[in-house]
Swiss-Prot record:
<dbReference type="GO" id="GO:0019843">
    <property type="term" value="F:rRNA binding"/>
</dbReference>
<feature type="region of interest" description="Disordered">
    <location>
        <begin position="1"/>
        <end position="52"/>
    </location>
</feature>
<dbReference type="InterPro" id="IPR036227">
    <property type="entry name" value="Ribosomal_uL15/eL18_sf"/>
</dbReference>
<comment type="function">
    <text>Binds to the 23S rRNA.</text>
</comment>
<dbReference type="GO" id="GO:0006412">
    <property type="term" value="P:translation"/>
</dbReference>
<dbReference type="GO" id="GO:0003735">
    <property type="term" value="F:structural constituent of ribosome"/>
</dbReference>
<feature type="compositionally biased region" description="Basic and acidic residues">
    <location>
        <begin position="1"/>
        <end position="11"/>
    </location>
</feature>
<dbReference type="Pfam" id="PF00828">
    <property type="entry name" value="Ribosomal_L27A"/>
</dbReference>
<dbReference type="InterPro" id="IPR030878">
    <property type="entry name" value="Ribosomal_uL15"/>
</dbReference>
<comment type="similarity">
    <text>Belongs to the universal ribosomal protein uL15 family.</text>
</comment>
<dbReference type="InterPro" id="IPR021131">
    <property type="entry name" value="Ribosomal_uL15/eL18"/>
</dbReference>
<dbReference type="InterPro" id="IPR001196">
    <property type="entry name" value="Ribosomal_uL15_CS"/>
</dbReference>
<keyword id="KW-0699">rRNA-binding</keyword>
<keyword id="KW-0687">Ribonucleoprotein</keyword>
<dbReference type="GO" id="GO:0022625">
    <property type="term" value="C:cytosolic large ribosomal subunit"/>
</dbReference>
<comment type="subunit">
    <text>Part of the 50S ribosomal subunit.</text>
</comment>
<dbReference type="InterPro" id="IPR005749">
    <property type="entry name" value="Ribosomal_uL15_bac-type"/>
</dbReference>
Length: 148
């Protein structure tokens, strides 16, 4: 039986690793112009990948965008009081954690309660923000709207 192959005995197959041709290293081996032809921009340097051959460049053809991104913008996840009334028909205290557990919003984000729909049960809602109509409807039903 032959000996097992060992890692230090491994060699690439003959002719599989061809040496890279080093151009511009003497007349005998692609020296002088080194395969670039004679004269001109491409013989002297690389042309920028963004250069479009004198055609108006893409970044200049596209329209400018107006406005800016407000760094102070606060994004709220919204939930309507109709959804709260549907998920909590027994009434009682409703915190942000309860709203997340009910699947109305994602966790770790701010919650705003909006006044779309009607509410008949008494809910003591705690959220990060309330619309005016939501606050009125919750308080009209006998509940309270507390900002967390």
């Amino acid at each position: 039986m032959s000996e097992p192959i060992k890692l230090h005995d491994l060699r690439p197959a003959a002719g599989s690793n061809k040496a890279k041709t080093r151009v511009g290293r003497g007349e005998a081996s692609k020296g002088k112009t080194a395969g670039r032809g004679t004269k001109g921009t491409k013989a002297r340097k690389q042309v920028s990948a963004a250069f479009e051959g004198g055609q108006m460049p893409l970044q200049m053809r596209l329209p400018k965008l107006k406005g800016f991104k407000n760094p102070n913008k606060v994004d709220y996840q919204v939930v309507n009081i109709a959804d709260l009334a549907e998920k909590f028909p027994q009434g009682g205290d409703v915190s942000i954690a309860d709203i997340v557990a009910a699947g109305l919003v994602r966790k770790n984000e701010l919650v705003k309660v909006l006044g779309n729909g009607d509410i008949s049960v008494k809910l003591n809602v705690t959220a990060n923000k309330f619309s005016g109509s939501a606050k009125e409807k919750i308080e009209a039903a006998g509940g309270s709207a507390t900002v967390a």
